[in-house]
Amino acid sequence: MQNTTKRDLERLINNKTSNTSLADILFLKFSSDTGTILNFGRRGSLFAPEAILNVVKKMACHNLLKWSDIELANSALENIDFKASQKSLALQIEQTLAAQARTQKFVYLGGGHDYIYPTVKALNRFTKKMVIINLDAHLDTRTDPDPNSGTPFRQIASEFDGDLEIIQLGIHDFANSISTMSNLSRAREVVATYEDVRFGTKDFTETDKFLARVIPYQKETVYVFSLDADALESGIMEGVSAVNHRGLPYDFVEDVLLYAIDELKCQHFGIFEYNPVYDNLSQKGARTLASLIYQIMDDRFFT
């Protein structure tokens, strides 16, 4: 027991604060899988935020940055009126962001990918120019009449007030219907399939050149990094609703993340759709995602 206490002093758990106003990094947790279930996905992503953070807490700490977390999902309301719950959550996120004068990095942990919609809706209150970088096997632009984890980017595109670009990386034709691929109403959408990414980076060896061409830096633009865990190859990511047998390699995903941080000055990061129920006993998926979060929490990216 004494060894555990001593070791925790050198782990990230020691930098956690219960006072969110003191946090340099804030995790907004969405511990619900209602949107995934409405999209006919497998139950279990509601456990993802805690499963991922439990791994993060044990990682060695090499800076003095404070972090905190807050739970915002309201599964009870979601089960009664999902549309109303999304509007309510967008307001909650907006109020949370407005109150965080000190925080420089925000990490949004789902839950289903439906949570990117209220997140962007809230961010739209602070900016009229945004680029979303979505790493995913699916476009998540379904034309379903009722919202779910497969519809968020079509919802975002139809409601965004301003200049919006959605860059989709790692998409598979076999995972997206013709209607899903139909044009978005009020946003520019750039789609780079798995094949486009693979050949554009020369088998993932020239990622920086590819990213500089596809996602050039634009001034006065808010960048949002959004990762659906099923974008990652199944060898490292089994714990998802739809396992990707031809997914992106970890190094590429990390390169995109680092490019977003270093070159695009990104402050908003979403990680969605991880399902610990279907992960293996080694928590391989949670450890993979925690490694990405560890990069976000590195102090070399803070001013």
Regions found by a protein language model. Name each.
Residues 2-303:
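Conserved alpha-helical scaffold segments that buttress catalytic/binding sites
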